[in-house]
Amino acid sequence: MAQIRLKNFRKYESLDSLNLNNINIFVGKNNAGKSTVVKAIMLALDNIRSLRWKDVTSKEGMQSILISPKPLFRFDANGFHNLHIGTFERAKCNWLDDRRIVIALEYNGVEFEITIAGLMGDGQVSMPIEKLKISVPFHSNYEFDFSKNTMTFSLGEKLANDPSSETQKAMWWTNDEIAMAEKDVEEAAASGDALKVAEIQQNLQKLISRRKALQSELKQLEKKGEIAHATFDLSYFHESVGENILVQYIKTFIMIADTPITMKKNAKGYSDHVSKVQYLDENRKVIAEAADKLEKVLSNIFVDYIPAHAATQKLILSVDDKQDINSRIVHEYFQENILPGESADRFMKKWLKEFEIGEEIYVKPLDGEGYYVKVDTEDDKVHLADMGMGSIQLVILLMRLTTIGHRSESSLQPWWIIVEEPEQNLHPMLQSKLADLFEDFTQTFCDPYTHTLIVETHSEYLIRRTQIMAAEFVEDCGEDMMDEMIPFRVFYFPTEKGRQPYDMQYLPNGMFANKFDPGFFDEAGRMHMEILKKSKKG
């Protein structure tokens, strides 16, 4: 399950782990911290995916050399969206007297924890990473402490415990079989069946031999269990300039296992060092698996940010206008070349009808200069620019979701999609349908992975619709399956300093277990009561 945790980042002195679902609704007053979490996610993932070795050319002899491999964290990373952070000083929590920022998140089955230490007042755009932890849950863990120049490997809980427990189970079964065989020998001897006694005794000897082998294996596993982790001086295995530095750091553990031990046998710490190297050697397959998984994850980080934007009624959308989000979305949708009958095409047509916009859209290029968009309604083909602001807003959103869905089918990887206030310009009924749209998106484009959506919203109607859908999921599948079947999770962000965002938690009937702060769900009712009071006075 995707998650995010923060310390000393912008609004948050400390943000407890937010465990995300497929579709996550962030709600709260302005400046409550919703965008802070979103920015932390994009900033961290942008940095993680782009860490590479730096290759420079020396002045002497023009030979290629490597500069220090200590990775840098860039606060001006804007690969997914312009985050407007820029420096360490703007990233940290202003009122907390701590020079360390921690961002921890889980992405596609790998957990990352990054610690950056900086100084205030220097306008530092990038800072060396002080500590980096990488975990493949239940598999293996890696920690690189650049302040102490150490690197540590340990097995995940499942791998650390399973071998011994499986051997122990085999021991129990063997002991049971031995006890039964001994009883059978006694019964056969009492009946005077010498042939059967000999047959059972032969099997009994095999069982006893198996037990001895299992006892020996258990002793070896117990000996291995004495090493909970292996820590070494920080070093690195450099294979290629283009490979992500994190993958190469993990591969370094295999390099250490392959390097002959030069320490003298009578040197202090020799036995401990040998045990740690053996621990790496015994787990080289585990380390190689982690490196392969990490390489795949880092090569396929897909994040898309769909900002709240003004619906434009420009007839021609220029390809040269890089600042116009509408132009970019239309351009990329056209370039995707979605064919009739594909799932992305069916998705687009379905939701054009659901939102009562039309039957189909047509994007027409203008000699490489730009595009115009027409919508096929029941009566005619209408320029999108001539439609209402709400329809324009929805078509742009649908084009972006369709583009992402089509791309995800090619990449076969999950995406993180962040949608900012999609309810702008929409009638309340259409706002509620956004919940159905997002749920259908995750169902249509979910093979083989499920995407993670984060929706920042102030729409009561969208949230109310998720409650109805949650209750319907429970009716269809039963209360025991509600956690698996409900794709939504609503997080409320309080504005008060020190308070944590919290999961509203759906009940089986669709109601929330927790309450919103005053001013959200209760605001319409409060104003209605005010009107009633005034009408009575009149």
Segments (PLM) and residue ranges:
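Short, cationic low-complexity segments
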Residues: 133-143, 328-339, 518-519, 523
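Extended helical coiled-coil dimerization/tether regions that scaffold
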Residues: 185-201, 205, 209-212, 216-223, ...
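Residue-identity detector for glutamine
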Residues: 3, 63, 124, 168, ...
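A cross-taxonomic marker for long C-terminal extensions/tails that follow the last structured domain
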Residues: 528-538
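P-loop NTPase switch/coupling surface
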Residues: 1-299, 470-483, 491-492, 537-538
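Switch/communication elements of ASCE P-loop NTPase nucleotide-binding domains
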Residues: 1-91, 102-103, 341-523, 527
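Short hydrophobic beta-strand segments that form the core of ligand-binding sensory/regulatory domains
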Residues: 133, 305, 396
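Residue-level signal for secondary-structure boundary sites
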Residues: 111-113, 314, 498
